[in-house]
């Protein structure tokens, strides 16, 4: 089915104007009509400031209604929403503002200090729209985001296909902007979206609106506990709106597991997006602390790109007897290449089944997905981004034409099992995946080497029961006994996002590199886990 999120949301708002669209717990509710009008007013504000089709609008916010209003408003005029990581430091934000050619930055007042520094580093004019998530003065030259509320809504016009960017986590260098077509994303989502809701596949926009406004349909209430800048969280909430459901937003910026459990109960949440164990474990523990024995209304939980252990899934199935957990093997650049679906404890241990369009390639780039025991890189031939923005070389390297089909090869190594299942072996690189955030070792090493007295450094991940992996480092200095490891970690934290700071550090006099400059990573990782210190 062809369609555009903007058009469909507008039609749903006309057909069911009074249904809740976005509920901020304990604060406010936007109905479908109010959300539609807010998006139209924000679109008018953008146009007033010279923003048009294909112009880039960066969004640097925690999960808030304004995030979704900005996203929807961009789609209405063909502007390109560019979600940014609110954990980034000024230099990282400036680099992405520059890389994306953003002309507008929507940001939270709580992030104003880092934004001011980032904008100064960009060194070119940007339209700044400040969301008052905390009481704070506007940055010089900034506009209050709430000003859009006094604009006349931009009249609706049928949307023409546009784009939105999702930045990679930087597994092979600096983050890259994957350019997703809006209509392409919708067509990719339709199959899993409607089947997971127990609905027939729509053949037309009329079908979408009819099912979204059917009074007899089971209500869809979605809560994303991972940030909207991540693909799984974003698609969870925008697809809930497409089904005629509502999105629940927590009022606090920081993840609060107890508040999340209370919201699931009080707001009758039916589906939740998480980042594996990093969020799911505190969620289960919070339910225990609150004396909540069962979450019967919770029917779906989705997670992607993060360790999600069977022991955690077992606890979740016991807590939520009607829950279907979908563990998604995916990358920013491609669709879901594998799904680990469990409906009860009986389905454990969970296994990844390859999705249609997924293949496994050996070193010669030949397909081996039909050969049990074969090891290779998993690849996807279905819907995928148009490429990386302004990076034709990396686009050509990662989006490969093979046997007449375009393939995205994200680099994950798998072992082929029987009946279409695969076992994930690793990322095929030294990237650290911590809580769903990908951390490129080179940038952390660079920060470590800027600390006085550090002669050499290597960064890698070590296993962690909650986050999957945490950043660890081995550093060389002439006098190991004199090194202040806590100060070293804080030094990194002043230059990079907090989650990139080393959580385990081994201090030595020499890294004992080989003549070619390499270290035995397996040995170093084991030594650091056993002998390293926690800052």
Identify the meaning behind each predicted range.
Residues 31-33, 163-203:
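Conserved AMP-binding A3 loop
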Residues 170, 243-245, 270-274, 285-349, ...:
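Gly/Ser/Thr-rich phosphate-binding loop
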Residues 188-224, 229-271:
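Conserved AMP-binding/adenylation subdomain of ANL enzymes
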Residues 359-381, 418-419, 481-485, 520:
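Conserved beta-loop-beta connector loops within the AMP-binding
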